[in-house]
Amino acid sequence: MAIKVRLPASINQGDLEIDAEKLTVNQLIALLSQITGKDLEKILKRDGELSPFISIFVNGRNVRYAEGLETEVRSGDEVSIVPTVAGG
């Protein structure tokens, strides 16, 4: 099995499948940077933490309420990276 990653169209056209048994979200971001050729560390992180303008979900659970960037992602998990939207 693989880790399924859903990315916004601004980062990649379509979903990706990563062949890995276990990674942290931080390691996944570094790997996705290599695969997409985009500096996702700069886009998704600010001062070593997850940017307030991005939400990352592992199996529907926001990593901010888990272990943050150290949240483990395992084979068979689904990761969604979405821009945060606000309005008023």
Swiss-Prot record:
<dbReference type="InterPro" id="IPR010038">
    <property type="entry name" value="MoaD_arc-typ"/>
</dbReference>
<dbReference type="InterPro" id="IPR003749">
    <property type="entry name" value="ThiS/MoaD-like"/>
</dbReference>
<dbReference type="InterPro" id="IPR012675">
    <property type="entry name" value="Beta-grasp_dom_sf"/>
</dbReference>
<dbReference type="InterPro" id="IPR016155">
    <property type="entry name" value="Mopterin_synth/thiamin_S_b"/>
</dbReference>
<comment type="similarity">
    <text>Belongs to the sulfur carrier protein CysO family.</text>
</comment>
<dbReference type="InterPro" id="IPR052045">
    <property type="entry name" value="Sulfur_Carrier/Prot_Modifier"/>
</dbReference>
<protein>
    <recommendedName>
        <fullName>Putative sulfur carrier protein AF_0552</fullName>
    </recommendedName>
</protein>
<dbReference type="Pfam" id="PF02597">
    <property type="entry name" value="ThiS"/>
</dbReference>
